Amino acid sequence: MERTPEYYLTKGLDMVVNGVAAVIFLCCLAYAGYALWDNWSILDGSENALKTMVEYKPDEEEGLSYNFSQLMAMNPDVCGWIVMDHTGIDYPIVQGEDNFEYLDKDALGNPEISGSIFLDWQNNRKFTDPYMVLMGHHMQAGKMFGDLDKYSDETFFRKNTTGKIYLPDRVLYLETAAFLTVDAYDKYIYRTQWDNVSERQELLKRIYEQAQYTRGEELTTEDQMIALSTCSTSGTNARHVLVCRIVHSSASEEGSGKVYVETENE
């Protein structure tokens, strides 16, 4: 059969299309490989920083002050250590000069895309405010505050209710009270200064308005509260927030968990 110019043109176009498709496929394959490597390197970096610090994780039997002196020697911004039972949340807490400093630094102060768990810069680093906010990235494999997602399941929320925050001079025992999804710019949930009872009533009203689940006795203005916040996949500005009450402090003779009088930042 005689091959016409149209035949060669069609053949050439087919080769071009196949070549372009092959290039696109190889680019996609390379990108997928890079994404996997990038995710691994992020998780590996945060794990390495934690391994360095976990040796000095506070222990009541060994003595809180000794362990914290070691941690603070590595980074003076370390102010606590949080553990939420039956989750992967088991990390040092830092406090920076603002709420941006530790978004991309590990708890040793080194550059790290997974960041750190950090206390709002306006809160007292001694954890004496009536309402405090802890923030952390929502990372894969439950790293950092990724496991806050677990509390979006009502069964998990109701069965897993406890946690601790280790401080240089005492341990705060936490009890979960509410799980909510809010906007990142919520003027109540992310406000840290609540100077009087009437203002704190507004905060409590907001918590219960936004709550997906609540448990235990209803929060009151006498409760000292800590909110754990991370990004939510439900929207760009959506945030998951787990509100906990302090039910007991190992350094408190009464163990009432009520608000301390000291509120001035260091």
Positions of PLM-derived features:
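Hydrophobic membrane-insertion alpha-helices, especially the h-region
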Residues: V16-L36
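Solvent-exposed, non-transmembrane regions of membrane-associated and secreted proteins
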Residues: L29-E266
